[in-house]
């Protein structure tokens, strides 16, 4: 379990990242980067994997991490595919930390064991998230509590980084109650929990029914940590109502695919489609102000959360303007 010393260190780094985010808009808060598109699983709802691609060469990955550092990115989350299939994952994590950025990872958890967790500790991983889809594996998903519970116990015993367990409700989930079972088990083990709404291949969703909504609400009440607290955007979506918000994808949030191109997110790949090596502050400023047509019904939590810092930033900007006009500053 994450020690108090590690938690304090991580919290200080988080506060520094948030402070800089409030002061300046011309840099990414969060970048999600793919070192490995291949996955050991084949979940029926997922469009983010293949079965054939090779890992991105380490030198290429390190260059991309360096570029994210040059763009003053706050957090880098490694995803896939399944990132733990990359043979030099630990070196990628170390490079993120060496460049002063917070290091996170999204994994299906199948490769986690005591020795592998200790290597992640040594590499400097700070966050890890696993989404667990059901209690018992089925034809849609093998990411079940039955399959992964031992891995969760290993994490509770050995991980010195923050662990968040995400459960899922929505279309395609046969037993909505499984989400609550997963959340309760994660809480028992001392992890933070969150609940997501399963989206379609464009990041949109259908409203939840009454049963799913009740389970969602209970999971939210059970949840703890930042993932659960910044979830207001889901309240409208579960009732089929749009959100009125400014998506900052391409600016505050970057999705970098295995080819090294910058996209809005995992579900809106193709634009801007600019190589990360060429992505500049001008691109960030342009996308910061660009409305996104998919935003009203978007369920992509990481984009909402990265964009949310500017919601809190606006009152500070207004206060600063007022203070200057009043000769306070």
Language model features by range: what are they?
Residues 2-127, 320, 329:
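Conserved alpha-helical substructure of the radical SAM core
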Residues 18-22, 239-243, 284:
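Short, P/G- and charge-enriched loop/turn segments at secondary-structure junctions
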Residues 29-34, 230-236, 276-289:
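Short, intrinsically disordered, charge-biased short linear motifs at domain edges
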Residues 33, 37-40, 241, 288, ...:
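Processing junctions and N-termini across compartments
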Residues 38, 42, 46-49, 250, ...:
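Cys/His-rich metal-chelating microdomains
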Residues 56, 102, 122-127, 131-263, ...:
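Radical SAM enzyme [4Fe-4S]-AdoMet core and its adjacent flexible, acidic
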Residues 259-329:
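Flexible mid-to-C-terminal extensions adjoining Fe-S/redox cofactors in radical SAM and related proteins
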């Amino acid at each position: 379990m994450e020690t108090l010393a590690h938690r304090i260190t991580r919290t200080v780094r988080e506060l520094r990242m948030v402070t800089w985010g409030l002061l300046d808009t011309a840099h990414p808060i969060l970048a999600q980067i793919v070192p490995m598109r291949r996955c050991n699983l084949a979940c029926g709802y997922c469009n983010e994997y293949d079965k054939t691609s090779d890992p991105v060469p380490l030198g290429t990955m390190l260059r991309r991490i360096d570029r994210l550092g040059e763009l003053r990115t706050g957090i880098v989350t490694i995803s896939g595919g399944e990132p733990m299939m990359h043979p030099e994952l630990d070196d990628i994590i170390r490079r993120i930390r060496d460049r002063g950025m917070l290091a996170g990872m999204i994994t299906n958890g199948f490769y986690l064991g005591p020795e592998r967790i200790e290597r992640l500790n040594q590499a400097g991983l700070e966050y890890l998230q696993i989404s667990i889809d059901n209690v018992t594996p089925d034809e849609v998903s093998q990411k079940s509590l039955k399959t992964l519970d031992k891995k969760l116990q290993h994490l509770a015993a050995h991980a010195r980084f923050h662990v968040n367990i995400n459960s899922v409700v929505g279309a395609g989930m046969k037993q909505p109650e499984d989400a609550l079972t997963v959340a309760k088990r994660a809480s028992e083990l001392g992890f933070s929990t969150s609940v997501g709404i399963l989206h379609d291949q464009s990041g949109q969703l259908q409203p939840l029914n009454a049963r799913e909504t009740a389970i969602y609400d209970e999971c939210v009440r059970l949840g703890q940590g930042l993932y659960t607290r910044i979830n207001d955007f889901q309240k409208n979506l579960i009732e089929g109502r749009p959100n009125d918000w400014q998506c900052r994808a391409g600016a505050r949030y970057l999705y970098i695919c295995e080819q090294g191109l910058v996209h809005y997110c995992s579900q809106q790949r193709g634009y801007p489609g600019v190589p990360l090596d060429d992505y500049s502050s001008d691109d960030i400023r342009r996308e910061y102000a660009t409305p996104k047509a998919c935003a009203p019904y978007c369920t992509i939590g990481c984009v909402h959360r990265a964009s949310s810092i500017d919601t809190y930033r606006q009152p500070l900007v207004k206060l600063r303007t007022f203070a200057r006009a009043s000769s306070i500053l």
